[in-house]
Regions:
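Short, acidic, metal-binding catalytic loop of nucleotide-sugar glycosyltransferases
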Residues: 26-36
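Acidic donor-binding/catalytic loop of UDP-sugar-dependent glycosyltransferases
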Residues: 49, 88-105, 181
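Short aromatic/hydrophobic "clamp" motif used to bind/position activated sugar donors
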Residues: 85
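Glycine-rich, basic loop-to-helix element that forms the pyrophosphate-binding segment
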Residues: 64-80
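A conserved acidic beta->alpha catalytic loop
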Residues: 27, 43-51, 92
């Protein structure tokens, strides 16, 4: 039986995320979209109820073998049927119109990848200001060729994604920057303030603002200067 293609595949990596993934998938399920889309969870062999919750929300579940979020994204993309792949994380809550607004950016046939807006879930003033700065970085730096990507809200045209090899499942961190750098060589970048996801602050608060900022700044610089990104990124539950 032939696979039925869809317009968009929404791909969510997960590992032991039963506390969070329900809210994420519920928000995705509520999306109003002019086309057709599927939801895929790339699961890292979760030991809790993550897989059951995912299936209860109608997601297709595939297990990844690398023990990384990138592995989950890659495994999901391997079975995806969409023309556009949208990637988020299991602890996010996508906003209204998210799928449609991302899809609309790809109506320009020259666009091969895109990034949307991020906002903190239950954030304080410092976290909201930080998110504004990150959104400005994404909107301004990428068109200049200096790739900045937040893997919580990134999308790619399927044909370009596979032409560049897609996510590297072996990368523990900076897999989103790696993908963006590969896609940048193939076509145009787009950014939408309307395509918003609310992101968890659990890692920011666990690590502290300074440690979080210095870690990701260091990884960003490593990616752009040809050095290996960090291999350490412990789960925060």
């Amino acid at each position: 039986m032939a696979k039925k293609n869809v317009d968009v595949s929404v791909i969510v990596p997960a590992y032991n995320e039963e506390k969070y993934i329900g809210a994420c998938l519920a928000a995705i399920k509520r999306q109003k979209f002019s086309g057709t889309f599927e939801v895929i969870v790339g699961d890292g062999n979760s030991k809790d109820g993550t897989q059951k919750i995912s299936r209860d929300y109608g997601a297709r579940v595939v297990e990844e073998k690398f023990g990384t979020a990138s592995g989950g994204r890659y495994a999901g993309s391997k079975i995806a049927r969409g023309k556009i792949y949208i990637f988020t994380s299991s602890d996010t809550v996508p906003g209204e119109g998210w799928v449609q607004n991302i899809y609309d950016m790809f109506q320009d046939k020259n666009v091969v990848w895109a990034v949307g807006n991020v906002r903190p879930l239950e954030g304080n003033i410092v976290e909201h200001v930080g998110a504004v700065v990150l959104n400005i970085c994404a909107a301004v730096l990428n068109p200049l060729g200096l790739v900045y990507v937040n893997g919580d809200n990134v999308a790619a045209r399927a044909s370009a994604y596979w032409k560049c090899g897609g996510f590297n499942p072996r990368l523990k961190t900076a897999e989103d920057t790696d993908l963006g750098m590969k896609l940048m060589k193939l076509g145009r970048f787009a950014f939408s303030r309307k395509a918003t996801v609310m992101i968890s602050m659990r890692r920011v608060r666990k690590w502290g603002y300074w440690n979080f900022m210095t870690f990701h700044t260091g990884n960003f610089l490593a990616a752009h200067f040809g050095r290996a990104p960090s291999k350490m990124y412990e789960p925060i539950r």
